[in-house]
Amino acid sequence: MSRRYLFTSESVTEGHPDKICDQISDTILDALLTQDPSSRVAAEVVVNTGLVLITGEITTKANVNFVNLARKKIAEIGYTNADNGFSANSTSVLLALDEQSPDIAQGVNTAQETRQQDSDELFDKIGAGDQGIMFGFASNETPELMPLPISLAHRIARRLAAVRKTGELSYLRPDGKTQVTVVYEDGRPVGIDTILISTQHTATIGEITDEAAVQAKIKQDLWSAVVEPVFGDIDVKPNDQTRFLVNPTGKFVVGGPQGDSGLTGRKIIVDTYGGYSRHGGGAFSGKDPTKVDRSAAYAARYVAKNIVAAGLAEKVEIQLSYAIGVARPTSILVDTFGTGKVDEETLLELINQHFELRPAGIIHTFNLRNLPSERGGRFYQDVAAYGHFGRADLDLPWEQTDKAELLKQAANESLSAAIAQALT
């Protein structure tokens, strides 16, 4: 008997209060790494009505104007009208910054493997910036090897922002959320159950002043200008049974930091796989690459995506764990959920042979310290909204599948060797 079930993921627009914070944090990171690639950064941001607080720990040789960086990013997002209770020019920006703890720095600067003279390898010189667990995931249900629900939620959120910025739907405002419920049958997406969009808007639209009429206009426009274009190249499409919900409270005029406070690192499921895979709990934004919350999560995605791209599993989840001040992972776990074409022990061997998972090695593989300067001063801020994974619109090193053929060949060789041994 086939199993039919629903799975839901959400996304938010760049104007959501939490995402404002993520983007300011990563704008600061970009600026610091551009001037000083060795900067140690843990930049946290809080926003509320008329207020931005930048706090955290930063050790750097760079000289940047944090206040100007925050205002510029807020304006880029679209908050330029003081009447909305939050705008680039009128908001107060407060700073409360310290340097990185020397107790932490000594373990990052010189890993335990080097301090105890257990290794003289280059990649053993830098220790993990903290303990923790990180997950990476990939699935073959979309071309970008991401789960369909989060992929659709991001697409709708990005399209929602696009029609606002181009003026196609000029009454929209920056804050917004999306949610998509996908119908699955035997583990494969077969339909769209529900599409939800909550979007900030003006109180009236032209001469339309009645609240119900305003919402009817928004719903009609969002279907034609946002939803239909998103599903144009998607095989699984909404039908006449699909529920389409828009601003279910009845209106969404008060939004952004005036409606809700925001905080860096509060949208970690939106940033990753939409709940389809497990999450270790660590946020990404505002953290330099020595923080394995970020860099190791990127590495785990890279491993998972290459395994699926190689055809060795239909979906796979990778767990990594680290100890603060230690270079080598304390554990690696592979789970193919029964979809593997080779056993998980073989996949673990392939990971150990072909992927570098020490922090210094991850930084080197992805060039994480130099990407901001090489890309005109902005890199991390562009992944701070609409997801860090599956981004076909961005050239992200951890999204490359350059090891897929190598893994496929190595897996075939391992299988041939196992067969030969069994026959002797």
Curated annotation (Swiss-Prot):
L-methionine binds at E57, Q100, D260, K291. Residues 100-110 are annotated as: Flexible loop. This is S-adenosylmethionine synthase. Its cofactor is Mg(2+); K(+). ATP binds at H16, D175, G176, K177, K251, F252, D260, R266, K267, A283, K287. Homotetramer; dimer of dimers. It is found in: Cytoplasm. One of its GO terms (biological process) is S-adenosylmethionine biosynthetic process. K(+) binds at E44. Transmembrane segments: none annotated. PROSITE patterns: ADOMET_SYNTHASE_1 (PS00376), ADOMET_SYNTHASE_2 (PS00377). Its EC number is 2.5.1.6. It is an enzyme of class 2 (transferase). Belongs to the AdoMet synthase family.
